[in-house]
């Protein structure tokens, strides 16, 4: 690929797409990690709500524990049980349970979301690179990647939080995707995710960002449960989730990955007009 020289605004096509994993590409509802965090805290005698477990979703998993323990509600319960406010040793203690629990359960949450295969085919049919990144660690991805591949999903690049100095909201995983895909500039890339952390990461990387809601963390429903929920209730959940992603900086918000290729075409039209993904 010919290097882009930044003496002008980039007005070419989208060159690559970077997908989040749980809640975006696989694991409808981001159910796997949410359940693990609830269970890990329970092992330490502290009950946490699923909503509390979901709040920092998208973060590197140790940081996820740290952010949960920093919540006033969780910290108060921790103090009531353990007699002290949470500190770094407590982060380590909870995380020591998170890692094996994730490794035990992650394979069951490798099912691609509806529409992923068709989206991947269209992206590759256009010659775009297909990257991915995740708050999961290296050992977790050693389980998840082959399980997803067995079900038909194999991105060109996989970057996990263990490979970079800091996970989301820092942009390093997106930059590493760009390096491995050989793609530049960053505004020729689109990040698709389902969490606030995804949106912040992409914005910090100077990428276009697309939020997905129906399959994502904030709606938090399996494919079956989403189909069974009364339409007005599901729509209300999705409206709240969409607003949260927009507030976090999403350029576009859609129901799921199945709706994302039309967004890529819309982004290309904006690029051709000289638009950029970052504020002036």
UniProtKB/Swiss-Prot annotation:
An annotated GO cellular component: cytosol
Reaction catalyzed: phosphonoacetaldehyde + H2O = acetaldehyde + phosphate + H(+)
Any GO BP: DNA repair
Similarity comment: family membership: Belongs to the HAD-like hydrolase superfamily. PhnX family.
Residues annotated for Mg(2+) binding in this entry: 20, 22, 194
Organism: Nitratidesulfovibrio vulgaris (strain DSM 19637 / Miyazaki F) (Desulfovibrio vulgaris)
The keyword Magnesium belongs to this UniProt entry's keyword annotation: yes
CC cofactor note: Binds 1 Mg(2+) ion per subunit.
Recorded GO MF terms: metal ion binding; phosphoglycolate phosphatase activity; phosphonoacetaldehyde hydrolase activity
Enzyme Commission number: 3.11.1.1
Biological function: Involved in phosphonate degradation.
Top-level division of the source organism's lineage: Bacteria
Enzyme class: hydrolase
Pfam families: Hydrolase (PF00702)
The protein's name: Phosphonoacetaldehyde hydrolase
């Amino acid at each position: 690929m010919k290097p882009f020289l930044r003496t002008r605004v980039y007005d070419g096509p989208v060159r690559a797409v970077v997908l989040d994993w749980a809640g975006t590409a696989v694991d409808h509802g981001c159910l796997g990690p949410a359940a693990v965090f609830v269970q890990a805290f329970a092992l330490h005698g502290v009950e946490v709500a699923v909503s509390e477990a979901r709040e920092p979703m998208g973060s590197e998993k140790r940081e996820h524990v740290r952010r949960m323990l920093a919540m006033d509600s969780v910290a108060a319960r921790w103090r009531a049980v353990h007699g002290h406010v949470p500190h770094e040793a407590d982060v380590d203690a909870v995380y020591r349970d998170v890692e094996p629990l994730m490794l035990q359960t992650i394979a069951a949450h490798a099912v691609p979301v509806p529409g992923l295969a068709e989206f991947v085919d269209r992206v590759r049919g256009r010659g775009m690179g297909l990257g991915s990144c995740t708050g999961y660690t290296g050992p977790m991805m050693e389980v998840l990647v082959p399980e997803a591949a067995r079900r038909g999903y194999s991105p060109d690049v996989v970057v996990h939080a263990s490979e970079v100095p800091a996970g989301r909201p820092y942009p390093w995983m997106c930059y590493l995707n760009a390096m491995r895909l050989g793609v530049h500039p960053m505004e020729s890339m689109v990040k698709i995710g389902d969490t606030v952390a995804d949106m912040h990461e992409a914005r910090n990387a100077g990428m276009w960002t697309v939020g997905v809601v129906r399959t994502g963390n904030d709606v938090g429903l399996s494919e079956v449960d989403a189909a069974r929920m009364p339409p007005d209730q599901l729509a209300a959940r999705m409206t709240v989730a969409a607003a949260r992603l927009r507030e976090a900086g999403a350029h576009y918000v859609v129901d799921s990955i199945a709706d994302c290729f039309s967004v890529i075409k819309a982004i290309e039209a904006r690029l051709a007009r000289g638009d950029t993904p970052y504020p002036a």
